[in-house]
Each structure stands twice: as structure tokens, then as C-alpha cells.
């Protein structure tokens, strides 16, 4: 990639292509697909999302033991969360697309190769995370297919209610297994996108903050400039910071409620899967299948917490850069402007979910402890039922 031509939105191209396939990002009305996109969206979402959700939910309601309830809940709750996330993306789509213009505006403000290299490194990191999640989900789907193939009796990848008799006939079983696996592959694509797009946006915000910190730290050094020129440069940097804050607040509005639900959903999934694996009577392939699901769900939340801390970390670097610039030799007006920027930089860029819960590694640790507490409670219920 040419270092002189940096486009931050390149990291988002695959995400929005997948969202278009998912039926929530319509193309132009002049195209054939655009004119029929509404019908396509309805067919796709009913077939691959609503039907599979109904199957999971009915199977959950038909649970007749704590073990089967836990096995069903650990797939029903995350899938419900993904559907809510998809609805949220559709609701906030216009605002998220408009943020691309702000990213391109920040790209134009890059002043040297070092800053461009920072942005390129962020794009490469986001693409690496996307590829890694894709490989993890692919391994999970492949393992599920192996589990189906190796099973001694007709079974599906995850516990599902099917409204017809699919166990007694080989042809009915094969058709059902193929349909079910295809639907889960479509949902795996959805999970890939919904798991990685928040991290991509957060990484882009963090690297642009880092590039701005580099620009600010160089203020006042090098060849002397007139006071008016220095003030104009600083005003430009303040505007850049305001754009970054707008991006961050836009992300917070887009992710807040779904992230709050994600913490709860992941904790429940961890608790129920661990209970099923520890106390359920399962074979090795079924054990591995559910274990991979546990790893995927936990990694998704871990990734969100990790990337949510990046803007906060780079915000602290920007604060340090404000102190590091050569402000002593500048005019009084310059110092006043710098104090305004300093005051705003002192407010940390902490992403908050559900108004009160910060998205951070500390919250992730609390979630793990909560899952362990619920697992202990389920174990006590199991012991009581056995007595």
C-alpha cells in the first residue's frame, strides 16, 4: 500500500459487504439488487435468523432437565443477542456510515509518514483480528460438522427443535442436517461481522488519536513560526480532537445497550456451558463442540473489552503530548488555547455500556467472576435435586 495514500475506511469494507449480504445495508435503488433488496432482506432474515431463533427457543422451552436447559440456553441466548445487535446496526446504519466521512477527513489531516504509518498499522491490526475471528469460527463450524458425521445416531450441530420427524428417515435426516448446517454457517458469518466491527471502529479511533498526539507533541519545535500561524495550527489540532470525540460518542451511542446485554449473555453462556460440560454425560466430540462455542463467545467479549481500552490509552498519550509540546516559548493566546485542549483531554475516553458499566478488562474480569458465581449456584441446585 502506498504510504502517501491512507484510507482508514479500507478496514471497514468487508464489514459493510457482509452487512449488505445480511440484508441491512441496501445498495443504490438504480441497480437491480437495490430495487428488490427489501424482498431479499426479508427472505434472508426470516430464513437464516428468525427460523433458527424460533427453533432454538422452542427447544429451550421443551427442556425437561437442568442439563438440557443449560445446553439449550447457551445457544439460544447468544443468538437472541446477535439478532438484537443486527437490529441495532440497522437502526444506527446512517450514523455509522456518516462516520466514514469523518475518518476520511482525519486521513487528510495526516502530516507526515510517521502518522500515516500509525494509521496503516491500525488498519492491519483490524484486518488481522477479522481474519483471526474468521479462522476461529471456521474451525468451530468444521468441528460441528465432524461431530455430526462421527455421531452414532442422528444429531444436529446444536440442540434445535425441528417441526418434522427427521430422525427415522435417512433422507429426511440428511436434508435437515444440511439445512441446519447451512443456517448455522450463515449465522457464523453474522457472528464474524458483529464480533469484529466494533473493534475495527475502536482501533481506528485509537490510531487517529495516536497520530494526533504525535502532531501535538511536535508543536513549537523546529523552525520558528509566527504566533498567528502557531495559533492556527493549534486550532486545527483542536478541531481534529473534536472530530475524534464525535466519532467516539457516535460509537458509544451505537454500542452502549448491546454491549451491556453482551456481558450478561456471555456470563450466562459461560455458566451454562461449563455446567453442561462438567456435570452432563457427553462424549468427546460433543464436549469439544461445546468447548469451542465457549471459547468463541468468551473471545468475542474479551476482544470488545481489549479494543475499548485502546482509545482511553491513546487519550492519555494525547494528554502527555499536550504537556510535551514547546508551549513555554509560545504566545499567551496559544497557551490559552492549549489550556482548553488540555481540559478536554483530561476527560478519559471510556466507552460505557448501559449508561453505568465501563467496557474494560476489569469489567471482563467481573463478568468471569459472575459466571463462576452462577455456576456455583447451579451446582448447589444440582446437589439439592440429587438428595
Swiss-Prot record:
Interacts with Orco. Complexes exist early in the endomembrane system in olfactory sensory neurons (OSNs), coupling these complexes to the conserved ciliary trafficking pathway. GO terms for cellular component: dendrite membrane; plasma membrane. Odorant receptor which mediates acceptance or avoidance behavior, depending on its substrates. The odorant receptor repertoire encodes a large collection of odor stimuli that vary widely in identity, intensity, and duration. May form a complex with Orco to form odorant-sensing units, providing sensitive and prolonged odorant signaling and calcium permeability. Involved in the preference for citrus fruits for oviposition, especially through the response to valencene, the primary ligand of Or19a. The lineage of its organism: Eukaryota, Metazoa, Ecdysozoa, Arthropoda, Hexapoda. This is Odorant receptor 19a. Expressed in ai2A olfactory sensory neurons in the antenna. Residues 62-71, 149-171, 276-285, 358-387 are extracellular. GO terms for molecular function: ionotropic olfactory receptor activity; odorant binding; olfactory receptor activity. The atypical heteromeric and topological design of the odorant receptors appears to be an insect-specific solution for odor recognition, making the OR/Orco complex an attractive target for the development of highly selective insect repellents to disrupt olfactory-mediated host-seeking behaviors of insect disease vectors. Odor-evoked OR currents are independent of known G-protein-coupled second messenger pathways. GO terms for biological process: detection of chemical stimulus involved in sensory perception of smell; signal transduction. Its main location: membrane. The chain crosses the membrane at residues 41-61, 72-92, 128-148, 172-192, 255-275, 286-306, 337-357. The keyword Transmembrane helix applies. The keyword Transmembrane helix applies. Keywords: Cell membrane, Membrane, Olfaction, Receptor, Sensory transduction, Transducer, Transmembrane, Transmembrane helix. Residues 1-40, 93-127, 193-254, 307-336 are cytoplasmic. It is a multi-pass membrane protein. Pfam families: 7tm_6. It is found in: Cell membrane. Belongs to the insect chemoreceptor superfamily. Heteromeric odorant receptor channel (TC 1.A.69) family. Or2a subfamily.
